[in-house]
Amino acid sequence: MTGDPALPPAAIRRITTAVIARELRRLRDEDIGQSKAAETVGHETTDPLALDSLETMGVATALGAVFQQDDLSFAPDTPATSADWAARIATRPIERLTVYTSGATGRPQPHAHTIADLLAEAHELARQFARTRRVVALVPADHLYGLIWTALLPAILDVPVIAGTVLTLPAPAAGDLIVGVPEHWAALARLGKPWPADVTGISSGGALPAALGEDLIAAGLTRLVDVYGSSETGAIGLREVPAIGYTLLSRWQLTSAADTATLVDREGQPVSLPDDIRPIDERRIELLGRRDHAVQVGGINVYPDRIAAVLGECAGVASAVVRLGDHGRLKAFIVPAGEPDEAALEQQLRQFVAARLAPVERPTSFRFGAELPRNPMGKPADWR
């Protein structure tokens, strides 16, 4: 093989379609609710996109940022399909792709990855999932997880991609690789549909509850693989449910000082991880929890302590604590100030969070009590 590695045309088309869909939602101020957990994945279409001049500029700028093409000259002069945009992009050298961190607060941070690194990761995954006949994408390809698993991987395996949602999921078939986030898998588990043999599920973008994974396997899903990584690093390790350990991809190595649980890349550079980890052996790690105390809702980082502080600013609230619930959304426990009507206070809180917090930050359930939940040792405890 000679020359630099190149992005497959099919991958360029899928990434382009997803970036255009995301940018048009932003420009048109559409409410996408739970983002990656609820959005409709962009589909390639043969119909020209109805863009005005400002939308054309916005789409060109967004694509230029992702594909690192600095000017807007690749923007078509006439109404064009997403495939037309992709074809223009493909005529130029693409050495890196830029992806963005997810977060409900703060500005998403860009992270550039070389095409060589992205393709190396996708080829390694292709070897591990070589029996795949079709990729079913419940996530778009405008973030690193979706880009690798639903754009690069199927292009390398030369298999079709079916994009959809939980409600429009095609009938699963042997050889399917279904790519989603924990909220998708929770919804599929609730639907209770039977799984045919030889269907593999992939999950990332948040913690996959152990009970959920076990329920899906018990219902007949052949494999469920939890992916650990970040927008900064790409995939770091894979965990076969119900195991607790993540097997490192070949790019990553544990340092000899195992007690510090430090990872280095193939160049020997240490990697800053969002989680504390514990080595199980030379190639497997266990996650011990986020260092920044963030949790993920729909693949987006949110911060329960910050949200609890905001709830504490609501009139009638003495103190509050926020946790991630079993259903993948946030829940709040409230200690009222005085003895207010709890139903009225809950209504007030829902109006308050709608005005102050992003959709993914808003607790969907509220419990009330005279004091915050604690265990017999006096430490913060969960509640039902």
Residue positions per predicted region:
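Gly/Ser/Thr-rich phosphate-binding loop
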Residues: 190-243
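AMP-binding/adenylate-forming catalytic core of the ANL superfamily
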Residues: 275-361
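Conserved adenylation A10 loop of the ANL superfamily
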Residues: 98-110, 231-232
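Conserved S/T- and glycine-rich ATP-binding loop of Class I adenylate-forming
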Residues: 63, 101-104, 135, 178, ...
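Conserved C-terminal "lid"/linker of ANL adenylate-forming enzymes
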Residues: 295, 352-384
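Phosphopantetheine-dependent thiolation modules in NRPS/PKS and related acyl-activating systems
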Residues: 1-97, 379-384
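AMP-binding/adenylate-forming
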Residues: 112-125, 134-188, 200
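AMP-binding/adenylate-forming core of the ANL superfamily
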Residues: 252-279, 283-286, 335
